[in-house]
Amino acid sequence: MFKIATLADWFGVGLIEGIRESERCGATGVQIYAADQLDPRTLGKDELQRVKRTLSDCHQTVTALCGELGGYGLEKTADNPEKIAYLKQVIDLGLELGCRVVTTHIGVVPRDKSNPRYAVMRDACAELGAYAAANGGWIAVETGPEPIDVLSAFIDECGAGVGVNYDPANIVMVTGVDHVEGVRIAGKRIVHTHAKDGKNLIPVNAEQFYHGFAEGGLEWMQSQGVLI
C-alpha cells in the first residue's frame, strides 16, 4: 500500500509543529524541505535529535526530503559543484532520518540531446544518482518542465539512483499532456509522487516559463497574461 504523507512545511506553523499537525490530520508520513531549520549545511546535532524525537512521538515517517536548488536547477556548469555538494548532504540527512528519497527540480531538460545543457544536467544527475544508489537511496526529479517521454529517456541515461517524482499538476499545467498516460510512460521510474491538481489555462513555453522566474522575469509573465 502507498504511504500517504503531508508536506510538513506547508502547514505554516514551523517544522516541529508541522510534524505534529501531520499526525493530527491522520497522515503517517511527511515530506520536509531540507532548508532553514533542516538545512544540512547548518543543522546542529541537538536540533536533529529534536526533529527525530518529534517524528517518533508523532508516529511520522519521512517519505522524502526536498532539496531545492533555486534558479536553473542543475543547468549551469559553474553552479553545479556547490549544488551537488548540497544535495549529497541532503541525501546523507535523509538516511539519518530513515528516508531514501530526495526530490528536486533540476531545470528544463532539452529535447535535443546535442544541446550542451543536456550533458551538463545528465552528468550532474548521474553523479548524484550514483551517490544515492550507493546508500540505497534515490534522487527523484520532479516532473513538469518537459514532456514525460523526454524526462524518462533522460533519466535512463543517468543510471542508477535517479528516478521520477511524479507531479501530475505540473505536467498538466505546463505541458498540457495526459497525466494518466504520463504514469504509463514513466512507469517504474516513479519513486515518489505529489498529490496536486491543476489546469492548463493558456499554452506556455516551458523554458520561458521556468527561466522567466530564474531570471527575475515577472514582467514577462504579466505581459503574457499568466498572472491575473
Descriptions of predicted regions:
Residues M1-G14:
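Boundary/entry segment of secreted carbohydrate-active catalytic domains
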Residues I4, E21-A27:
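A short, Lys/Arg-enriched amphipathic alpha-helix followed by its capping loop at the start of a domain
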Residues D9, A35, G70, G107, ...:
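Flexible loop residues that form catalytic
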Residues G14-R20, T54-C58, G73-Y166, M173:
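Active-site acidic/histidine proton-transfer and metal-coordination neighborhood
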Residues C25, Y33, E96-L97, N135, ...:
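Structural motif
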Residues T28-A35, T61-C66, R100-T104:
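Short, well-structured secondary-structure segments
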Residues V30, L65, D123-I228:
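Acidic/histidine-rich catalytic cores of soluble enzymes
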Residues Q31-S56, H105-K113:
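Glycine-rich, proline-tolerant flexible connector loops at the mouths of alpha/beta enzymes
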